[in-house]
Amino acid sequence: MARNKPLAKKLRLAKAMKQNRRVPVWVIVKTNRRVLTHPKRRHWRRTKLKE
């Protein structure tokens, strides 16, 4: 990836990075382990973003 990125692309990548987190532990505890997985979780090698 290029070192000099346009700001819009950089912001999109940052947003995708923030969204790509696990389900918080307090949510798992609160829902009594009904919610364990994150349906929109993305792996960097398997699923690529539209850039």
Curated annotation (Swiss-Prot):
Q: Which GO terms describe its molecular function?
A: structural constituent of ribosome
**What GO biological process terms does the UniProt entry carry, in alphabetical order?**
translation
Q: Which UniProt keywords apply?
A: Ribonucleoprotein, Ribosomal protein
Q: Cite the InterPro entries for this sequence.
A: Ribosomal_eL39, Ribosomal_eL39_CS, Ribosomal_eL39_dom_sf
**This protein's superkingdom?**
Archaea
One Gene Ontology cellular component term attached to this UniProt record is: cytosolic large ribosomal subunit
Q: What is the similarity comment for this entry?
A: Belongs to the eukaryotic ribosomal protein eL39 family.
Entry-linked HAMAP family: Ribosomal_eL39
| Protein name according to UniProt | Large ribosomal subunit protein eL39
Q: Which organism is it from?
A: Pyrococcus abyssi (strain GE5 / Orsay)
Lineage, highest ranks first:
Archaea, Methanobacteriati, Methanobacteriota, Thermococci, Thermococcales
